């Protein structure tokens, strides 16, 4: 699947592919252990890094809710094991809010960050799950995020990850205005 994605990305002149490992499990049932997932994902990536390098397409694992690479130290170690500029990371700001701090992830990952998703997350009271919300409506410390991105000299794409609602025709205007506010915080 990754080889096919590289081929498609090359045809589209796409410079990067977002990737993530299989989920460790579903609900309370463990399907793959952390070490097995690490080993299998690492092996799969080692096989395709030469193809990605030849195609000039970066492979960027993203921090997603799959119960794998749950800290910036784990993500950094995972990326660093390859010693390749063709494997970096796609960082999602909102995805870490349940178990970490985006600004800490940014400072820890530094130059390994190739792409960034902007998404907000509202933490809830104890025992109640949080939820993804519109930009600037959650608990992300956007000033801290922007300061961290500046500190690590990030100059790549910042793309909002939003749920499109056709019933709200002005939604993209609101997202654009929110992005302008966030970007002005640096």
Spans of model-derived segments:
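Active-site acidic/histidine proton-transfer and metal-coordination neighborhood
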Residues: 1-89, 98
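Histidine-acidic metal/acid-base catalytic patches
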Residues: 7, 13, 68-186
